[in-house]
Structure formats: C-alpha cells, structure tokens
C-alpha cells in the first residue's frame, strides 16, 4: 500500500541530499538552456531592428508599417529580457541553494567520518584495561627489586665464602712467616740462589755449590803442555 500511494521505504539523510543535489543540477541546466535560447531570440530581434532602422533612414521615416513592425519587435524583446532577468534570478537562487546543499553534504561527510573515527577509537581503547596495566607495571617493578636483592645476596655469599676459607690463626702464621723472609732482590746472578727465598725459586733453583776451576800457575801449565807433547 505504501508503494501504491507513494510512501515507500524511508530514505536516509544522505540519499535525500544526493537526490536534491541531482534535482538542483537538472533545474540549473534547464534554466541555463532557457536563458541561452532567450539570448539567441533577443539577438535576432536586435538584428531585425537594425535592418528596420536602416530602411527607415532611407525612407526618411515615411513608412508606418516599418515603425509598427519595429514597435512589435521592441515589445517582444522587452518581454524576453524580463523573462531572462527572472530566469537569471532563479538561476542565482538555485546556485545559492546548490552551494548550501554542497556545504551541508560536505558537513555530513565530515560528521560521518568523525563518528567512524570515534567508534574505532572507543573500540580500541575498550580493549585496554588501565587497572591491569597498572598491576602489570607494579609486578614488573617488584620483579626488578627482587632481581636486585638476589644480585646483592649472591655478591655477599661470594665475598663471605672467600673470607671464611682462611682462619685467623692461619692468617697470623702466614704473616709471621712473611715477616721473617727477606724479599730484597739480588743484584747479581751469582747471589740468586743464596738471597732469594726457597719457596720462590721452585724446581728451577740453581744448585747450592758450583765447582770452580783450579788456579794453576805458569809452571804447572808448562808441565802439562810438555807431558801432552
């Protein structure tokens, strides 16, 4: 029944704007065509009036028929000009309406884009739980503090283990032994084995004694040479 009586489905606001835009474009095009036709007719009437004027000048205004014809043409031209002025006013009104419609359509496009952006932002922010984010940050800080405490405990354990390996009695005995040793470095290679402590020489220490060559005087050397000959 609605279709029969012209009440179809309700159209959206965007569809109404598009249809009104199309109808105004068609109306403006029709007005432009009509104004162009009137301009052509007025130009033809002006050409006829020019010819009549030339004929009247030749006849010294002695032909009443030409004057009547010119008067009719002038009246017709005036009517056409009035029609053209009216159409120009209508065209200007249609142009203003078209501009208003275009602005409204652009505004609706902007509003729809803002609505879509707002909905998208709400959907994205809706997935974020600020309380959970804060809890996660607190947990991360706690884990960092626990890691720092663990490193401090490990460092303390390592240092205490090294100190606990040696007792106070052993430390005193070692210090006394070191005090009795002479750590003055020798000035020559011959005094290396005598002046350096034994525990610093190790397995590569030189022997405690060195055989020296006998001192032979000149006569003994000569006898040795004669016996050799």
Swiss-Prot record:
Q: Which GO terms describe its biological process?
A: late endosome to vacuole transport via multivesicular body sorting pathway; protein transport; vesicle budding from membrane
Specify the protein's topology with respect to the membrane.
Peripheral membrane protein
* Stretch list, region Interaction with VTA1: 128-159
Q: Subcellular location, in the record's words? A: Endosome membrane; Vacuole membrane
**One GO cellular component term noted in the UniProt record for this chain:** fungal-type vacuole membrane
Q: Which InterPro entries match?
A: Snf7_fam
Q: Which residues form a coiled coil?
A: 9-155
> Principal localization?
membrane
Spell out the residue ranges making up region: Disordered. 186-229
UniProt key word Transmembrane helix: no
Q: Which Gene3D superfamilies match?
A: 6.10.250.1710
Q: Which UniProt keywords apply?
A: Coiled coil, Endosome, Membrane, Phosphoprotein, Protein transport, Transport, Vacuole
Q: Where is the signal peptide?
A: none
Phosphoserine modification, residue list: 12
Q: Does the keyword Coiled coil apply?
A: yes
Compositional bias per record (Basic and acidic residues), positions renumbered to this chain = 218-229
The entry's other comment says:
Present with 2110 molecules/cell in log phase SD medium.
PANTHER family assigned: CHARGED MULTIVESICULAR BODY PROTEIN, CHARGED MULTIVESICULAR BODY PROTEIN 5
Assembly description: Interacts with VTA1; the interaction occurs at he endosomal membrane.
Q: What does this protein do?
A: Has a role in a late stage of multivesicular body (MVB) formation. Can stimulate VPS4 ATPase activity via VTA1.
Family, per entry: Belongs to the SNF7 family.
Q: What is this protein called?
A: Vacuolar protein-sorting-associated protein 60
């Amino acid at each position: 029944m609605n279709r029969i009586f012209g009440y179809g489905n309700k159209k959206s606001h965007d569809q109404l704007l598009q249809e009104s835009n199309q109808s105004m474009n068609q109306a403006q095009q029709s007005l432009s065509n009509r104004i162009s036709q009137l301009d052509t007719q007025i130009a033809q009437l002006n050409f006829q009036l020019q010819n009549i004027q030339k004929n009247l000048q030749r006849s010294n205004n002695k032909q009443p028929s030409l004057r009547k014809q010119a008067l009719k043409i002038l009246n017709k031209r005036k009517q056409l000009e009035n029609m053209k002025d009216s159409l120009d006013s209508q065209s200007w009104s249609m142009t203003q309406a078209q501009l208003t419609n275009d602005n409204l359509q652009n505004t609706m496009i902007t509003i729809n884009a803002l609505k879509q952006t707002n909905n998208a932002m709400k959907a994205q922010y809706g997935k974020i739980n600020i309380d959970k984010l804060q809890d996660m940050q607190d947990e991360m800080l706690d884990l960092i503090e626990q890691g720092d405490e663990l490193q401090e405990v490990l460092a303390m354990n390592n240092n205490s283990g090294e100190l606990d390996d040696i007792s106070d009695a052993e430390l005193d005995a070692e210090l006394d032994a070191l005090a009795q040793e002479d750590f003055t470095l020798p000035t020559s290679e011959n005094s290396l084995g005598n002046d350096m402590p034994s525990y610093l020489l190790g397995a590569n220490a030189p022997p405690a004694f060195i055989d020296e060559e006998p001192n032979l005087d000149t006569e003994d050397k000569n006898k040795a040479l004669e016996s050799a000959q």
